[in-house]
Structure formats: structure tokens, C-alpha cells
């Protein structure tokens, strides 16, 4: 749209003024000034008048850039079931998967969903334990990472599995305290009802690229999402997905009797030795060359240079799940070797996070 505008401009006295018009204006609409024929303006102490035509052009519409995730997020469902209206499933089996001499019990449990809780690998569900709290209100839900692939342990898409450690500790007053939800779950008998919410979460979803390098760092029950990944990669057949990349699992536990799903992972390694690497860190039984306890970051330090080279690739994805303390230890390792490349690790990690290549779920 064009508009003609007349502007009166007071000019300082001058014998002769040649007035080229060059104007730049920032406004919501772009203003285009067209020069009117005017060689000079004679001024006799009076106000001169300049006529200018101003053409306004509307700004081009802004096109919204849609970010495409590198993760398997198409059609993902979140929060289908809420605490006030949970899905009520039943416990099919509940098995202790740690040895009798392990420091604490961990249980693997399977619940029915009848396909009504459409979760993905890497998501979590909420559990609302039976009973009421000290204020007479229903217990609040607790979130647990799902330990089964999207089609479940039985391959029929009708179950969901969890990996839960029973929480029991002695407080400062010398009283034995039992975690409400973990003990509720570990004590479940087959046939018992369980209230399920969710599914929730997108942080830990698997990468879309079947040729990706997937580095998994887990401690204790933080192994849950990685079991779901690895079942899909190595135990299942899908028409639209076949993993051809490298999966590298680091699992940290206190004792060998605490190694979770060890036999499953060893079978995967036998089945796909070129695609699956497995490293355990058993802190109370193993030490490194310096005599230091073998925590997950200690084990990773043995492969620091190799891991760094993998992290330079744009199709390497790191997933971390488990105890929060592991994150600082891993940062310390990377910081110690990065000066060789002149790269600031903390800044580089931010870049990886932005690219969805560094994914953390710790507690």
C-alpha cells in the first residue's frame, strides 16, 4: 500500500542547499522513500516545504521453524493417566534379581496394561501406592523408569516392567525407615492391583538413527531404561527398525551380586559382538591400576580417549541414569583430558545437550 505524505521542514539559513534525501527508518512496516525531483532549495529565512512520497510495504510473514527431534518421538503419548484417574493393572510376576549377600534388594516386576498405557523406551510411569499418609491423604505417586521395551517382556504390547530397589534405612534417631512406594512394589504378589499413571518423559527417548553410537551410563536401578533400549536393539525384530550402530553399556554397582540383568546382557554380547560392548564397574571388588575403587567413572577413564573421539561424532548419543553423584565424576574425567584439544568440556557438553546428544536422568 502506498501513501503520499507532505512534510514541512524548518531548515537553517543557507545561501544554497542541495538536499539529497537518504533516510533509514526502523518501524513495524518497512518504509521506502522515493526521491522527488528537487535540485536545490532556496532559503530566505523562511520555512521550506519538501514533498516526499512514502511507500509502506508490509513485512513478510514470519515462518515458524519446526525443530525436528533426533529421537524417536513421533506419536509419543504423555500423561494419559493422572493420579486421580490412574490405570489399574495387575502384577503378573515379581522377582528378586539381586543375590542374598547384595547390599539391598532389587526386584523386577511385570504389570498388565492390556495395551492401554502406550509407553516408549526411555519413558517412565508413576505408581500410586495403596494406603494413606500420616495426614490421612492418599500417598503421592512415585516415578520409575520403565525397564521393558515398548512391546513388553512378553512381546505382546500388553505389559510394562519396572526395576525397583527396596528402600530401607536408619534415620538419625535410630529408627528404621521404609520407603513407602518401593516397599509396596517389592511386596506385591501376583494378582495384586497396582495404580499406574503416565507415561511421562521425553529426555531419555532412543535416537532415530539405527546407525548411531549409543553410550549408556547407569548405576544400580538406573539400568532400567537401558534394558528397554537393548531389548529393542538385540532381542526383538521390527519391520521399521534394525540397529546397526554401536551400543556401549557401562554399569556401576557395589558388588557382583548386585549386577542386574547380567545374563541377559551377556547373551546380547554373544549375539551381536560387533554392535554391543559391555563394561561393569564393581566398586567394592575391583580397583584400577592405581588401587582406586572401580566406580563407573573410574572404568570410563580407562577408555577416555576412545570415548572422546566418539563424542566428536554427530551421531553419538550419551544417556546417563542413576545416582546423581556419577555426573560430577564423569565431568572430572572429561575435563582432565580435554586440554589436549583445547576444548572446554563443560561448554562442549552444553553443545551436546542442545543437539540432544547428552541426556541425563539422575536422582
From Swiss-Prot:
<feature type="binding site">
    <location>
        <position position="221"/>
    </location>
    <ligand>
        <name>FAD</name>
    </ligand>
</feature>
<feature type="binding site">
    <location>
        <begin position="163"/>
        <end position="165"/>
    </location>
    <ligand>
        <name>FAD</name>
    </ligand>
</feature>
<dbReference type="InterPro" id="IPR035442">
    <property type="entry name" value="FNR_plant_Cyanobacteria"/>
</dbReference>
<dbReference type="InterPro" id="IPR017938">
    <property type="entry name" value="Riboflavin_synthase-like_b-brl"/>
</dbReference>
<keyword id="KW-0472">Membrane</keyword>
<feature type="binding site">
    <location>
        <position position="165"/>
    </location>
    <ligand>
        <name>NADP(+)</name>
    </ligand>
</feature>
<protein>
    <recommendedName>
        <fullName>Ferredoxin--NADP reductase, chloroplastic</fullName>
        <ecNumber>1.18.1.2</ecNumber>
    </recommendedName>
</protein>
<comment type="function">
    <text>May play a key role in regulating the relative amounts of cyclic and non-cyclic electron flow to meet the demands of the plant for ATP and reducing power.</text>
</comment>
<feature type="binding site">
    <location>
        <begin position="180"/>
        <end position="182"/>
    </location>
    <ligand>
        <name>FAD</name>
    </ligand>
</feature>
<feature type="binding site">
    <location>
        <position position="169"/>
    </location>
    <ligand>
        <name>FAD</name>
    </ligand>
</feature>
<keyword id="KW-0813">Transport</keyword>
<feature type="binding site">
    <location>
        <begin position="283"/>
        <end position="284"/>
    </location>
    <ligand>
        <name>NADP(+)</name>
    </ligand>
</feature>
<feature type="binding site">
    <location>
        <position position="145"/>
    </location>
    <ligand>
        <name>NADP(+)</name>
    </ligand>
</feature>
<keyword id="KW-0934">Plastid</keyword>
<keyword id="KW-0793">Thylakoid</keyword>
<keyword id="KW-0274">FAD</keyword>
<keyword id="KW-0560">Oxidoreductase</keyword>
<dbReference type="Pfam" id="PF00175">
    <property type="entry name" value="NAD_binding_1"/>
</dbReference>
<feature type="domain" description="FAD-binding FR-type">
    <location>
        <begin position="84"/>
        <end position="206"/>
    </location>
</feature>
<keyword id="KW-0602">Photosynthesis</keyword>
<dbReference type="InterPro" id="IPR015701">
    <property type="entry name" value="FNR"/>
</dbReference>
<dbReference type="GO" id="GO:0004324">
    <property type="term" value="F:ferredoxin-NADP+ reductase activity"/>
</dbReference>
<keyword id="KW-0285">Flavoprotein</keyword>
<dbReference type="GO" id="GO:0015979">
    <property type="term" value="P:photosynthesis"/>
</dbReference>
<comment type="similarity">
    <text>Belongs to the ferredoxin--NADP reductase type 1 family.</text>
</comment>
<comment type="pathway">
    <text>Energy metabolism; photosynthesis.</text>
</comment>
<dbReference type="InterPro" id="IPR017927">
    <property type="entry name" value="FAD-bd_FR_type"/>
</dbReference>
<keyword id="KW-0150">Chloroplast</keyword>
<keyword id="KW-0521">NADP</keyword>
<feature type="transit peptide" description="Chloroplast">
    <location>
        <begin position="1"/>
        <end position="52"/>
    </location>
</feature>
<dbReference type="GO" id="GO:0009535">
    <property type="term" value="C:chloroplast thylakoid membrane"/>
</dbReference>
<dbReference type="InterPro" id="IPR039261">
    <property type="entry name" value="FNR_nucleotide-bd"/>
</dbReference>
<feature type="binding site">
    <location>
        <position position="221"/>
    </location>
    <ligand>
        <name>NADP(+)</name>
    </ligand>
</feature>
<dbReference type="InterPro" id="IPR001709">
    <property type="entry name" value="Flavoprot_Pyr_Nucl_cyt_Rdtase"/>
</dbReference>
<dbReference type="GO" id="GO:0009570">
    <property type="term" value="C:chloroplast stroma"/>
</dbReference>
<feature type="binding site">
    <location>
        <begin position="253"/>
        <end position="254"/>
    </location>
    <ligand>
        <name>NADP(+)</name>
    </ligand>
</feature>
<dbReference type="InterPro" id="IPR001433">
    <property type="entry name" value="OxRdtase_FAD/NAD-bd"/>
</dbReference>
<feature type="binding site">
    <location>
        <position position="361"/>
    </location>
    <ligand>
        <name>NADP(+)</name>
    </ligand>
</feature>
<feature type="binding site">
    <location>
        <begin position="322"/>
        <end position="323"/>
    </location>
    <ligand>
        <name>NADP(+)</name>
    </ligand>
</feature>
<keyword id="KW-0809">Transit peptide</keyword>
<feature type="binding site">
    <location>
        <begin position="142"/>
        <end position="145"/>
    </location>
    <ligand>
        <name>FAD</name>
    </ligand>
</feature>
<feature type="binding site">
    <location>
        <position position="293"/>
    </location>
    <ligand>
        <name>NADP(+)</name>
    </ligand>
</feature>
Amino acid at each position: 500500500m502506498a501513501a503520499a505524505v507532505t512534510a514541512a521542514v524548518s531548515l537553517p539559513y543557507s545561501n544554497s542547499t542541495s538536499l539529497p534525501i537518504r533516510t533509514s527508518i526502523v518501524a513495524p512496516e518497512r518504509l521506502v522513500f522515493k526521491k522527488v525531483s528537487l535540485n536545490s532549495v532556496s532559503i530566505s529565512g523562511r520555512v521550506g516545504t519538501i514533498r516526499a512520497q512514502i511507500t509502506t510495504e508490509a513485512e513478510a510473514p514470519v515462518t515458524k521453524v519446526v525443530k525436528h527431534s533426533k529421537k524417536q518421538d513421533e506419536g509419543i503419548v504423555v500423561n494419559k493417566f493422572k493420579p486421580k484417574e490412574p490405570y489399574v493393572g495387575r502384577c503378573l510376576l515379581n522377582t528378586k534379581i539381586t543375590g542374598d549377600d547384595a547390599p539391598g534388594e532389587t526386584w523386577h516386576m511385570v504389570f498388565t496394561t492390556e495395551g492401554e498405557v502406550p509407553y516408549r523406551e526411555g519413558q517412565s510411569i508413576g505408581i500410586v501406592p495403596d494406603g494413606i499418609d500420616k495426614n490421612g491423604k492418599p500417598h503421592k505417586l512415585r516415578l520409575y523408569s520403565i525397564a521393558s521395551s515398548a512391546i513388553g517382556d512378553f512381546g505382546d504390547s500388553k505389559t510394562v516392567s519396572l526395576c525397583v530397589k527396596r528402600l530401607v534405612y536408619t534415620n538419625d534417631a535410630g529408627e528404621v525407615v521404609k520407603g513407602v512406594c518401593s516397599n509396596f512394589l517389592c511386596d506385591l504378589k501376583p494378582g495384586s492391583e497396582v495404580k499406574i499413571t503416565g507415561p511421562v518423559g521425553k529426555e531419555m527417548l532412543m535416537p532415530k538413527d539405527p546407525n548411531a553410537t549409543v553410550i549408556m551410563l547407569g548405576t544400580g536401578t538406573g539400568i532400567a531404561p537401558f534394558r528397554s533400549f537393548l531389548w529393542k536393539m538385540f532381542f526383538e525384530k521390527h519391520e521399521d527398525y534394525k540397529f546397526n550402530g554401536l551400543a556401549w553399556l557401562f554399569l556401576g554397582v557395589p558388588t557382583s551380586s548386585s549386577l542386574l540383568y547380567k545374563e541377559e546382557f551377556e547373551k546380547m554380547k554373544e549375539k551381536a559382538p560387533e554392535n554391543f560392548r559391555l563394561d561393569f564397574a564393581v566398586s567394592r571388588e575391583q580397583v584400577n591400576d592405581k588401587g582406586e575403587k572401580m566406580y563407573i567413572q573410574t572404568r570410563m577413564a580407562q577408555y577416555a580417549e576412545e570415548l572422546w573421539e566418539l563424542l566428536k561424532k554427530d551421531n553419538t548419543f550419551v544417556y546417563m541414569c542413576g545416582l546423581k553423584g556419577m555426573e560430577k565424576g564423569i565431568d572430572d574425567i572429561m575435563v582432565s583430558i580435554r586440554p589436549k584439544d583445547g576444548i572446554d568440556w563443560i561448554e562442549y557438553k552444553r553443545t551436546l545437550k542442545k543437539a540432544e546428544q547428552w541426556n541425563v536422568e539422575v536422582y
